[in-house]
Amino acid sequence: MNYAYKRWGFGLVALLLSALTATAAVKVHTIGDSTMANYDENSTDKRGWCQMLQQFFNADEVVINNRGKSGASSKSFYLESAYWKTVIANVNEGDYVLIQFAHNDEKNGGLDGDDVIAHAKENGQSTDGIDYRGTTASGTFKKYIRAYIEETKAKGGKPVIVTPICRKYFSGNTIRRNGMHDLGDSFSILGSSSKGSVPESDNTYDYAQALRDV
């Protein structure tokens, strides 16, 4: 009889645990720049798109942890202690991490800020006006994006690369990708160094293009 109770008890615990697992809220961490960040609704009409994201979900099912930072580049968000380190520390297995950078990586004409600073110092030149946030589109930008991907996966998280918010550079009826770091629909080139494919999205380009066509 005791064995029957034990079997029944274990079965009940398993059932309860499965119910908790089924109803646990999905957590989505979002990292990026000003187009994603939170803003004070009492002082400005500016809004980051991830600031508005929670309203599309039941908070019991999906929780948005928006960590977008105005002025952040892929490099500065990774290196400055208040940002990526505090995000990745709270990423758990099954969490999603939305990654969106590019606009602030285009400093110094597409040159890496640290390289430009080092070159200036070597030649006795002023470093005033050189922005360390800058990355090279084919080098350090990809390096930091890959770091976000690989560190997220190492924690059991699911990285999602989001292309930067589309800028209104129209040439006739077509939007030109002026941004040097705007990889468009080609983020798959990161795959070879990212241990598998990573989902990508370019909906803001498609949306803006559709409005222009109207």
Segments predicted by a language model, with ranges:
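Bacterial N-terminal signal peptides
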Residues: 11-19
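Short, solvent-exposed loop/turn segments at secondary-structure boundaries
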Residues: 40-44, 76-79, 173-174, 199
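Alpha-helical cap/lid subdomain in secreted, periplasmic
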Residues: 6, 85-214
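Charged, often glycine-rich, active-site loop that binds/positions anionic groups
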Residues: 73-87
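Serine-esterase "nucleophile elbow" of acetyl-processing enzymes
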Residues: 23-69, 84-97, 115-121
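Bacterial N-terminal signal peptides that target proteins for export
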Residues: 1-12
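Active-site neighborhood of divalent metal-dependent phosphoester/pyrophosphate hydrolases
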Residues: 33, 69-74, 104-105
